[in-house]
Amino acid sequence: VKTFVESGMKGVILTAKHHDGFCLWPTQLTEYCIRNTPYKDGKGDIVGELAAACKKYGIKFAVYLSPWDRHQANYGTPEYVDYFHKQLTELMTNYGEVFEVWFDGANGGDGWYGGAKDSRTIDRKTYYNYPRIYEILDKLQPQAIVFSDGGPGCRWVGNENGFAGATNWSFLRAGEVYPGYPKYRELQYGHADGNQWVPAECDVSIRPGWFYHPEEDDRVKTVEQLTDLYYRSVGHNATLLLNF
């Protein structure tokens, strides 16, 4: 975190749970979490440790929480939605101020749900009950920016290459884009006649993929490449989210 601050970054977003369903905090909702690992003899809490480090060094803290969970046996049922809302509540309650909550638009598909290989489909527009999610966030973290394909706080830019359109409006037409249903070109440029303020966020990895592999350490982006990404994201009226 000290390195992030020295690099001039404004905030850190931690992937608290990705699609695999493993939780980096000692959640009380599932055994599939850091509590049941050798890390710090089962007493570790990476979410808590990072939140504390961000507070120490004066940088904003945020979390990514995947709606899709390829581990939970009840994914695709109403019971899972309740579970997901409770996960969100834990994260929004126990770790101080959160400046952004990041919801991935990848939802439904193949997984090992409850240990059985299966494929699940959902109604992406209605399944997660986003109105209820927004109520939880308004109550527990009213200042938090909500990221998804369509906002409402900020939107995905429609690609994972780290750049926005040369013309990139901060508006969307309300109701035309929603989480899990991206309109790639429209997200890249926004709507000039939009009536909802939803600025774009450009996500890109500093290495070839999203996850760490030691053999890729000599393939990280160069200063020249990163500078170009900065100009094509921040310089195109968007924020830049750089994955490490």
Segments from the language model and where they lie:
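Mature catalytic domains of secreted/periplasmic carbohydrate-active enzymes
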Residues: 1-244
